[in-house]
């Protein structure tokens, strides 16, 4: 399958400028859905999708028919990972649990998109409870490979061009990794920069709302709607100094991925970027263990009542997580939660002392694994999630014919500059 171009910025310009109508654009996206969904399975089935989307697009047109200035996402079709509650649609969170057991008020992030004029194209496939048990989604670049997870459907739907923007979430690596596998841009903002209310939780101390677009310009447009108190830089920031973490961390990636990463660093040097090697994350093993304990323990707490009532409907991988979480001592959970800030401070101190503006690292250990029973390893994304720092994943070539990416992480709260830099970095990669 050949991925299809459908960048957010072009859609926004055409819709707000009157070159396309929401009804016509929605029809185009629905035609793309009809063309690819039987192969990719990025969206959840919805019996009356076409009628609902047409009605919603018509309502947006009517509401703004006489408006001189259209809302920022006027008529833009969007996808929403099926852990986000949406009024009028069930939430299953990739599970076999009854929707009424998971029901809740509409997610703030969904409301932000709809208030900005977006049209919901549909819910996207997620692994069970945003953990590892996969759904049916396949990688648009090679249908025999995984799209990654847990935001499998959102990444794949953006890659296929079914829609230009989709919400996801990341508790370990569930935005940046599938973005790398599917050859799109993934954004994990600073922790809680996008509110997580109305989202089925896995580990509240690690859960981040994120999203996917086809390019960095689109990622910046979406951030202006989704991120709280967004303040774009008055002037475009200077080229960032790029820091590279320790080999102890980098060596978690495979040899082919590390070669691709070094090639990307060479491209950045050629383009005038200063690259600084550091010993940051040389204690990655303890960071990994701490984060995994925290996720397991919090998942066990969050799912306690549901698991007691519906334990026989949980996938075995999720059962194992919850059972492991029950065994995590309370003191270890407290230490893990405190460790988030410790890591954030350590990374910030290293950036300050070395004069580094962004960290660069492989966005995954390698390209998408073959098969769809395994969504890949999130280990390269884990420390940035644990620290809660803003991270953007950018496409950076291919390995073995499959997309790979580079992730860039900035200081906590420095989302605005990170996404401004991302547009320049994308042009080099």
Range-by-range predicted roles:
Residues 18, 29, 75, 81, ...:
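Glycine-rich, small-residue loops and helix-cap segments
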Residues 1-54, 270-273:
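An N-terminal boundary/leader segment
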Residues 105-223, 390-398, 403-405:
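Short glycine/serine-rich loop segments
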């Amino acid at each position: 399958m050949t991925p299809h171009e459908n960048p957010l910025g072009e859609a926004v310009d055409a819709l707000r400028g009157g070159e396309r109508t929401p009804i016509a654009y929605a029809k185009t996206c629905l035609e793309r859905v009809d063309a690819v969904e039987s192969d990719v399975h990025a969206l959840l089935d919805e019996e009356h999708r076409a009628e609902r989307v047409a009605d919603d697009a018509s309502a947006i047109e009517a509401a703004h028919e006489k408006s001189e200035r259209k809302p920022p996402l006027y008529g833009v079709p969007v996808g929403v990972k099926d852990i986000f509650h949406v009024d009028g649609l069930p939430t299953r969170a990739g599970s076999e649990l009854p929707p009424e057991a998971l029901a809740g008020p509409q997610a703030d992030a969904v409301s932000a998109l709809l208030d900005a004029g977006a049209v919901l194209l549909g819910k996207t496939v997620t692994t069970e409870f945003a953990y590892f048990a996969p759904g049916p989604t396949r990688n648009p670049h090679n249908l025999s490979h995984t799209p990654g997870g847990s935001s499998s459907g959102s990444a794949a739907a953006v890659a296929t061009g079914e829609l230009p923007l989709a919400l996801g979430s990341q508790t370990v690596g569930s935005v940046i990794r599938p973005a790398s596998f599917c050859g799109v841009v993934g954004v994990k903002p600073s922790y809680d920069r996008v509110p997580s209310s109305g989202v089925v939780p896995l580990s509240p101390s690690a859960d981040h709302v994120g999203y996917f677009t086809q390019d960095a310009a689109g990622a910046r447009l979406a951030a202006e709607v989704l991120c709280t108190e967004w303040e774009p830089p008055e002037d475009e920031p200077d080229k960032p100094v790029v820091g590279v973490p320790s080999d102890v961390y980098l060596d978690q990636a495979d040899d082919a991925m590390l070669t691709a990463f070094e090639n990307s660093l060479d491209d950045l040097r050629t383009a005038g970027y200063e690259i600084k090697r550091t010993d940051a994350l040389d204690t990655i093993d303890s960071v990994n263990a701490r984060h995994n304990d925290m996720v397991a323990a919090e998942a066990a707490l969050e799912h306690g009542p549901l698991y007691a009532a519906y334990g026989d409907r949980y996938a075995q991988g999720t059962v194992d997580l919850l059972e492991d979480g029950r065994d995590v001592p309370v003191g270890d959970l407290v230490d893990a939660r405190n460790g988030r800030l410790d890591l954030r401070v350590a990374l910030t101190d290293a950036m300050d002392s070395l004069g580094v503006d962004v960290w660069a690292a492989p966005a995954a250990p390698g390209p998408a694994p073959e098969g769809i029973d395994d969504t890949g390893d999130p280990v390269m994304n884990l420390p940035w999630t644990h620290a809660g720092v803003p991270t953007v994943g950018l496409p950076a070539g291919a390995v073995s014919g499959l997309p790979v990416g580079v992730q860039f992480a900035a200081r906590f709260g420095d989302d605005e500059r990170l996404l401004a830099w991302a547009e320049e970095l994308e042009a080099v990669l």
